[in-house]
From Swiss-Prot:
Source organism, top-level taxon: Archaea
GO MF term set: DNA binding; DNA-directed RNA polymerase activity; magnesium ion binding; zinc ion binding
Location of this chain's protein in the cell: Cytoplasm
Family: Belongs to the RNA polymerase beta' chain family.
Catalysis performed (reactions): RNA(n) + a ribonucleoside 5'-triphosphate = RNA(n+1) + diphosphate
Protein name as annotated: DNA-directed RNA polymerase subunit Rpo1N
Species name: Saccharolobus solfataricus (strain ATCC 35092 / DSM 1617 / JCM 11322 / P2) (Sulfolobus solfataricus)
Length: 880
């Protein structure tokens, strides 16, 4: 056979002659099997259509199951029927061409002119050619009289799904498929071309079916159910219906049955052919099984998430993969993934024997499939595969191994694997990790790596894939390893970084009140794989003490400079320069942390232009990995030794504080009552562009918002700055000051759709309030805190506000998912060329420079091509 390169694919419509030529037999009988259960010749299960039973030979090609591709048959339709998928095109042809002569309803000169332009541009600029044909169609459809034969044109009406009518003088007449086919046959090839179709592959009359292709048995095999009964495929059921109605129609015509009966059968044939193509046509009842289940016909096999394209071509099930629940493990590297031994023994990596690894691989073969690290298969140089489960003397087999053999060995520590969590919304939802085989049944993941996967440990499952070829392993190692993706391509900041305990530990270690003896410093540094000389202690008498800042400085590069506010720098502890008594402004000079604390702004994940960001960007991602594997463990060790716990007293306020909050509540109530009274008296000043009612709502909301923030300020003022709940909120480790306000002081206004809760009963939200009551408590304002507990009415309003959040989340997820799919489909053909432009498949320029600046965010300084301030700070030690 000669080899040829595929240059392109062209789609068209099968002509009746082509259908007959590719068919091996006509299908004429609706009966499928005889009394013995043998397929009948001439039925939809005719043996000539392909083999589905093992051991049988195909009568057509002589091949057995697996090698026989299957063969088409055909059904000669007694009367033509409309192809339901091409109704739109048929409608356009009927409207754009003359009912008498079949010409396009534009003048000969125009046809000649447009044909010339169309032929010149169709290959080079297909989108422009498409616009031209659309223009020709629209112009032709408007013509009332044919410019070629002067025939008056009647309006064509389509009644979906497939009924065409013509509005004549004498009334509305239905166009049968035969009438339509006659008209379409009259259209000359030159006119077909100018309407945007290729007459060699898509003649318009072929859209009206006279012959129906019957697909091979191989794509619609019958299956045996447990009871021994043979169950046919949905397509086979549909084809039997078509053959049965076709035969009945033929018999009725031959017997000279009344026209009404013939038309009914013709309509029924049209219905069965339409639902054979698509069983979800709007306005057409779906074809069903006896059980009431709709049949899955051709269109259903192709479209949708489970269809052929998305379900089997874009996305496939794969080998060498596993899935299980994930658990946290702060003791493994960010680059590692803990793999259960049972999975490591099931998934294999092919390793070729060389003189250097032969002894190691011999031992794996001796260990066999049940002992880790072992091997499952041996592949000989001749390609024969030996399954070690069935080898009795594995030692003997191991002794025969030689270079050239391939051993499919178990996963071992250090192997490269791909790790993924669905939904995979961006590139770093799939990254490469090194294997660390551990006891247990779950995958272990370092907590720092959760953000790119959007993973948590409340039952999430993740997928692990094992690359099989050296090329795939090398690619994963060089491009996909976790530490090479710490900086996200989304905004050029670190997506992997500290969260929760890490931030709390870093803050408690760096705060200026933390002093450590040499033993304590050694104990917390013991978890890091480093040799560090802390130098002279900061405090020499009465006892020698190191500060937490000294411990952290030991991990920083000696030429690193940084200035910036910490997360705790807000409210009464706000500092904007080095002269800060609150330790909330960070200063690092020549790698020494002189003042300030490490919190979310310094080392947190998803914090661009932070200390962590500049350390990774300026000193390599390898250094970033080392820092996270060592310094971050020190933070966790410190918080373990120090103790970090939250108790009820952390959100309990004293009586004097409560009294202060109650006074504010009384003041706000009076203010709201005054506003309501002013509204009733007509004295309220409306806000420009708002009605009086909307203005009142705005005034009330402003008053209540002020009340909640005042209550929060009062509570914060009296909370101990080392109260751990407050530490979490201020450092950015978890929660916010608002959460503490809600726990300690009050919940505040509950809203639905951005407004106070106003729906419920006819004139009030709940039966506990008077009709037309618009006071704060009657419209969802909660004066209680979580600490004191909610009243029954308050609990109801809180549930209403919470419900909206749940619904909103569910709706947003589906909408954003669909939007992303559409974006991916639209942008998938665009690429950045070597000249820096972004172009489509046809070479059309979409952007002159990628992103208008030609900068990839991952390698930018948080979006900026060059950050001059940072360069100054790095080199000189202060910002420009």
């Amino acid at each position: 056979m000669s080899e040829k390169n595929i240059k392109g694919i062209k789609f068209g419509i099968l002509s009746p002659d082509e259908i007959r030529k590719m068919s091996v037999t006509a299908i004429i009988t609706p009966d499928v099997y005889d009394e013995d259960g043998t397929p009948i010749e001439g039925s939809v299960m005719d043996p000539r259509l392909g083999v589905i039973e093992p051991g049988q030979k195909c009568p057509t090609c002589g091949n057995t199951l697996g090698n026989c591709p299957g063969h088409f048959g055909h059904i000669e339709l007694v009367r033509p029927v409309i192809h339901v998928g091409l109704v739109k095109h048929i409608y356009e042809f009927l409207k754009a061409t003359c009912r008498r002569c079949g010409r396009v309803k534009i003048s000969e000169d125009e046809i000649e002119k447009y044909s010339r332009i169309y032929n010149a541009i169709k290959k080079r600029w297909p989108s422009a050619a498409r616009r031209l044909t659309e223009y020709v169609k629209k112009t032709a459809m408007k013509a009332q009289v044919c410019p070629h034969c002067n025939e008056k044109q009647y309006k064509i009406k389509l009644e979906k799904p497939y009924n065409f009518y013509e509005e004549r003088k004498e009334g509305v007449a239905k166009l049968t498929p035969s009438d339509i086919r006659e008209r379409l046959e009259k259209i000359p090839d030159s006119d077909v071309e100018i309407l945007g179709y290729d007459p060699t592959t898509s003649r318009p009359e072929w859209m009206i079916l006279t012959v129906l292709p019957v697909p091979p048995i191989t794509i619609r095999p019958s299956i045996m159910i447990e009871s021994g009964i043979r169950a046919e495929d949905d397509l086979t059921h549909k084809l039997v219906d078509i053959v049965r109605i076709n035969e009945r129609l033929k018999e009725s015509i031959d017997a000279g049955a009344p026209q009404l009966i013939i038309e009914d059968l013709w309509d029924l044939l049209q219905y069965h052919v339409a639902t054979y193509f698509d069983n979800e046509i709007p306005g057409l009842p779906p074809s069903k099984h006896r059980s009431g289940r709709p049949l899955r016909t051709l269109a259903q096999r192709l479209k949708g998430k489970e269809g052929r394209f998305r379900g089997n071509l874009s996305g496939k099930r794969v080998d060498f993969s596993s899935r299980t629940v994930i658990s946290p493990d702060p003791n493994i590297s960010i680059d590692e993934v803990g793999v259960p031994e049972i999975i490591a023994k099931t998934l294999t990596v092919p390793e070729r024997i060389t003189p250097w690894n032969i002894e190691k691989l011999r031992q794996f073969v001796i260990n066999g499939p049940d002992k880790w690290p072992g091997a499952n298969y041996v592949i000989r140089p001749d390609g024969r595969r030996i399954d070690l489960r069935y080898v009795k003397d594995r030692k003997e087999l191991a002794s025969t191994l030689a270079p050239g053999y391939i051993i499919e060995r178990h996963l071992i520590d250090g192997d490269i694997v791909l790790f993924n969590r669905q939904p995979s919304l961006h590139r770093i939802s799939m990254m490469a990790h090194r294997v660390r085989v551990l006891k247990g049944l779950t995958f272990r993941l370092n907590l720092l790596v959760c953000p790119p996967y959007n993973a948590d440990f409340d039952g999430d499952e993740m997928n692990l894939h094992v690359p099989q070829s050296e090329e795939a392993i090398a690619e994963a190692k060089e491009i996909m390893l976790v530490h090479k993706n710490i900086i996200t391509p989304r905004y050029g900041g670190p997506i992997i970084g500290a969260a929760q305990d890490y931030i709390s530990g870093a803050y408690l270690l760096t705060v200026k009140t933390t002093l450590l003896t040499k033993e304590e410093a050694q104990q917390i540094l013991g978890v890091a794989d480093v040799k560090i000389d802390l130098g002279e202690p900061a405090i020499l008498a009465p006892r020698e003490y190191y500060t937490g800042k000294q411990v952290i400085s030991a991990f920083l590069p000696k030429d690193f400079n940084f200035h910036g506010q910490a997360n705790v720098s807000s409210g009464p502890r706000l500092c904007k320069n080095e002269d800060c008594p609150h330790d909330s402004y960070v200063v690092i000079k020549n790698g020494i942390l002189l003042e300030g604390v490490f919190d979310k702004k310094a080392i947190g994940n998803q914090q661009p232009e932070s200390i962590l960001h500049w350390l990774i960007k300026e000193y390599s991602d390898e250094y970033g990995k080392w820092l996270m594997d060592n310094l971050f463990r020190v933070f966790i060790r410190f918080v373990e030794l120090q103790g970090f716990t939250m108790r009820l007293e952390d959100v309990s306020l004293g009586d004097d504080v409560k009294k202060e909050i109650y006074n504010e509540i009384d003041r706000a109530k009076v203010e709201v009552d005054n506003l309501i009274q002013k509204y009733k008296n007509g004295e309220l000043e409306p806000i420009p562009g708002r009605t009086l009612e909307e203005s009142l709502e705005n005034y009330i909301l402003d008053t209540l918002d002020k009340l909640r923030s005042t209550a929060g300020d009062i509570a914060s003022k009296y909370l101990d700055p080392f109260n751990f709940a407050y530490v979490m909120a201020r450092t950015g480790a978890r929660g916010s000051v608002l959460n503490i306000t809600q726990m300690a002081a009050m919940l505040g206004q509950q809203s639905v759709r951005g407004e106070r809760i106003k729906r419920g009963y006819m004139t009030r939200t709940l039966p506990h309030f008077k009709p037309y009551d618009i006071s704060p408590e009657a419209r969802g304002f909660i004066y209680s805190s979580f600490r004191t507990g909610l009243k029954p009415t308050e609990l109801f309003f809180h549930a209403a506000g919470g419900r909206e959040g749940l619904v909103d989340t569910a709706v947003r997820t589906s909408q954003s998912g669909y939007m992303q799919r559409r974006l991916i489909n639209a942008l998938s053909d665009l690429r950045a060329e070597y000249d820096g432009t972004v172009r489509s498949l046809y070479g059309e320029v979409v952007q002159v420079a990628y992103g208008d600046d030609g900068v990839f965010p991952m390698y930018s300084a948080h979006g900026k091509t060059v950050d001059v301030n940072r360069i100054f700070e790095r080199v000189v030690g202060w910002k420009a």
